[in-house]
């Protein structure tokens, strides 16, 4: 009922709205920081008016904002006010360093470090269960525990947090190996290649790459939502194109700034372009 009640909120301002249960996130972007601040304040006033018209109150104490920027960019002076009250900013230098959006923990530089830290806490709990149970539970049951608990944790949001740097992902990769050793029943420090193969579990880097290609497959054959597909442009080729390498390839935009490679339009496109042409062609009429 609440979602029906606020269904026309996206029409009240220029903000891009993300409505999830009783949580609402408003997104706005601009190349000029001063223009962004002015636009954000103006649009917040429109949102506040919409709430008042619909007999609701926008609580400024519970409303926070985050300024997304590239790592190592210069610091900007940025303030937002609502009803004359300055809103709290979520940043690395503030009390709150991250915010959760639809299950993904975001920081202002999109390093996904805080998200990975939370994944490690969850996976360590699963590892504790597996370590304690490996002496009396059969391998089949331990594998079931891994797939239902740890596997689902690693899968969720992997095409986003999977674009983090290796220094951020490496502890997660090592933790997955600990989990696999406990599932397979081998001592700590043992090689895990055989265990991954026999258990039919993908290593984290391969899992991330696979999931990017699955998303890219939906984008290429336009089975994903149209508003997402339109951001991914294929390289235009003719039927008689002699450059086989250009067939079934996304046009990857030129990236002039370091850090932008984490955007799905870059990361997903590159994963698809790396995929073997035979796999792309054979998967046309079915799921990848």
Regions found by a protein language model. Give the residues of each.
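Active-site palm subdomain of RNA-directed nucleic acid polymerases
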Residues: 1-28
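Catalytic palm subdomain of template-directed nucleic-acid polymerases
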Residues: 25-49, 70-71
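Hydrophobic packing residues in well-ordered alpha-helices of helical domains and bundles
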Residues: 37-40, 44, 58, 116, ...
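Basic, alpha-helical interaction scaffolds
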Residues: 14, 90-160
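Short, charged alpha-helical motifs in flexible N/C-terminal segments and linkers
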Residues: 48-67, 100, 168-234
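Amphipathic alpha-helical
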Residues: 226-267
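Short, conserved micro-motifs composed of acidic
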Residues: 42, 57-97
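Short, conserved catalytic/metal-binding micro-motifs enriched in Asp/Glu and His
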Residues: 1, 21-25, 51, 99-109, ...
């Amino acid at each position: 009922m609440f979602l029906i009640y606020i269904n026309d909120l996206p029409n009240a301002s220029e903000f891009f709205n993300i409505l999830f249960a009783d949580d609402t996130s408003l997104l706005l972007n601009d190349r000029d920081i001063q223009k962004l601040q002015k636009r954000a304040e103006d649009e917040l006033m429109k949102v506040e008016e919409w709430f008042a018209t619909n007999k609701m109150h926008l609580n400024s104490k519970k409303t926070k904002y985050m300024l997304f920027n590239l790592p190592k960019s210069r610091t900007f002076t940025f303030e937002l006010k609502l009803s004359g009250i300055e809103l709290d900013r979520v940043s690395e230098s503030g009390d709150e360093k991250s915010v959760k959006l639809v299950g993904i923990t975001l920081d202002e530089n999109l390093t996904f470090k805080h998200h990975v830290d939370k994944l490690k806490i969850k996976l360590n709990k699963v590892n504790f269960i597996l370590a304690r149970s490996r002496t009396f539970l059969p391998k089949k049951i331990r594998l079931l525990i891994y797939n239902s608990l740890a596997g689902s944790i690693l899968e969720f949001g992997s095409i986003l947090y999977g674009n983090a740097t290796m220094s951020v992902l490496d502890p997660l990769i090592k933790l997955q190996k600990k989990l696999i050793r406990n599932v397979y029943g081998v001592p700590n420090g043992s090689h895990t290649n055989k265990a991954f193969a026999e258990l039919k579990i993908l290593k984290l880097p391969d899992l991330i790459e696979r999931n990017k290609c699955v998303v890219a497959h939906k984008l290429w054959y336009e089975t994903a939502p149209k508003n997402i597909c339109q951001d991914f442009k294929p390289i235009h080729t003719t039927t008689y194109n002699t450059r086989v390498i250009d067939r079934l390839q996304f046009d990857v935009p030129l990236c002039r700034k370091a850090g932008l490679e984490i955007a799905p339009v870059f990361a997903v496109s590159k994963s698809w372009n790396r995929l073997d042409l035979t796999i792309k062609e054979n998967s046309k009429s079915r799921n990848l």
